[in-house]
Design a protein with these regions (language model features):
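Mature extracytoplasmic/periplasmic domains
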Residues: 285-354
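Short, polar/charged alpha-helical segment
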Residues: 34-45, 49-51, 55-74, 260
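Conserved C-terminal helix/tail region of periplasmic/extracytoplasmic solute-binding proteins
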Residues: 27, 33, 345-381
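Non-transmembrane alpha-helical segments in soluble domains
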Residues: 90, 111, 115, 181-184, ...
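Extracytoplasmic ligand-binding site segments that recognize negatively charged/polar headgroups
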Residues: 53-64, 76-90, 98-246, 261
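Short, low-complexity disordered leader/linker segments with a strong preference
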Residues: 1-47, 379-381
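Bilobed periplasmic-binding protein-like "clamshell/Venus-flytrap" ligand-binding domains
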Residues: 49-52, 154, 193, 308-319
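Periplasmic-binding protein-like
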Residues: 220-225, 229-232, 236, 265-293, ...
């Protein structure tokens, strides 16, 4: 009896050892997910390529980690502003030539341009690895999709403590601000510069302003109407204007971290203790699968790698394409100590998550902004 037991142990031992090489015994078959994964990787290697249209989180150091793991898949990136890339994808689809396999950018571009343009397949069906499928590893114990069907637009970032309002440190005392309403005090009339508010680049900030129960449409009217900000399409240029002291405050400036490191007098207002709480934003961190993309298996491999612990740790290691600090992943089972303090979620703090699907419709807020802009033009006339 002792010999039989020992033999069983030996069989089990060798069964485990041979799992990666193929089953020796009937009970040693690979789990279904692993069979699917290995077939997908093999098919991706045959495709040999992945076309990735990506915004700010397409830095080479980050993507090189994927290239090291899957050298047989040539990762080709097209970088640019989210709305520009989204429009390009739609144009390519309508011309009959689908080039992009995956898109990563702002949730608003994903929803307003690609989802509404019926350009997306279900990214949910590409998830294979158990560690990616396990929703308990993610913020609030669930995957976040911003589309109504909960399957097309996967949000992988939850960035807190970003007010989106920047200031010239020589002209503004940040201690003046205890609430968002302090930003629209009459004293700031004519002292703002802002990104053009009708573009999707300000979408996350506009969602927060519009849908927050303590702010709403009245706040937007005061900001873009009463205060009469100067508008610009080039976000680097408006950052330069802020640094030069032409304006005291800015909405939607970009590359301020880099400018600050160069000794320029710019910084972002810290809203960590403001009355209305903190915005939780995707910060350009949502991903979608393009319908009819030429390399569907390579796309599946990348999605699973990127959403795995390895991929999301890599995401948190590197600054984005604009030099801004690495973002906070919605994965909660990975270290957060490499993040700057302002990008870490604070236990007990109040967060307003704009990636909730009920806030996805941008139409009412953009209509409001267009009305404000029209009224401004009429005043000039």
């Amino acid at each position: 009896m002792r010999v039989k037991t020992l033999g069983a142990v030996v069989l089990v031992f060798f069964g485990v050892i041979k799992l990666s090489d193929g089953a020796l015994f009937a009970g040693d078959a690979m789990p279904a997910w692993q069979v699917t994964w290995e077939k997908t990787v093999a098919a991706a290697k045959k495709e040999g390529k992945l076309n990735f249209y990506v915004g700010r989180y397409g830095s080479e150091p980050l993507l090189n980690e994927f290239r090291k793991e899957f050298p047989a898949i040539k990762l080709v990136t097209v970088n640019g502003a989210g709305n520009t890339l989204g429009t390009r994808i739609i144009t390519e689809i309508r011309s009959g030539t689908v080039v992009a396999d995956l898109f990563s950018g702002g949730a608003n571009t994903n929803y307003d341009i690609l989802y509404q343009g019926k350009a997306l397949d279900s990214i949910k069906t590409t998830l294979i690895l158990p560690e990616v499928l396990d929703e308990s590893k993610w913020y609030e114990g669930k995957h976040r999709y911003t589309d109504p069907e909960q399957r097309h637009i996967f949000v992988y970032i939850a960035n807190p403590s970003s007010s989106g309002f920047y200031y010239n440190t020589n002209l503004v005392n940040p201690k003046e601000f205890k609430s968002y309403w302090d930003l629209v005090a009459p004293k700031w009339k004519g002292k703002y510069v802002s990104q053009e508010p009708t573009s999707t680049g300000l979408g996350g900030g506009l969602q927060f302003m519009y849908y927050h129960p303590e702010l709403g449409p009245e706040f937007i009217k005061r900001l873009f109407g009463d205060l009469q900000p100067t508008l610009g399409r080039d976000r680097r240029q408006i950052t330069d204007w802020l640094a030069q002291g032409r304006y005291a405050l800015c909405v939607g400036c970009r590359e301020t971290t880099r400018a600050k490191s160069q000794g320029l007098p710019v910084d972002e207002l810290d809203n960590v203790d403001w009355k209305e709480g903190l915005e939780l934003t995707t910060g350009g961190g949502s991903m979608s699968l393009i319908k009819g993309g030429p390399n569907p298996n390579a796309a599946k491999v990348f999605v699973n790698w990127f959403l795995s612990r390895r991929g999301q740790i890599a995401l948190q290691k590197y600054n984005d394409l604009y030099g801004e600090d690495a973002p906070n992943s919605r994965r909660m089972d990975i270290p957060k100590d490499m993040l700057v303090a302002t990008n870490r979620m604070i236990p007990g703090k109040r967060y307003f998550d704009v990636s909730d699907p009920k806030y996805a419709d941008m139409t009412p807020m953009f209509n409001l902004v267009k009305e404000i802009m029209k009224a401004r033009e009429q005043i000039k006339e």
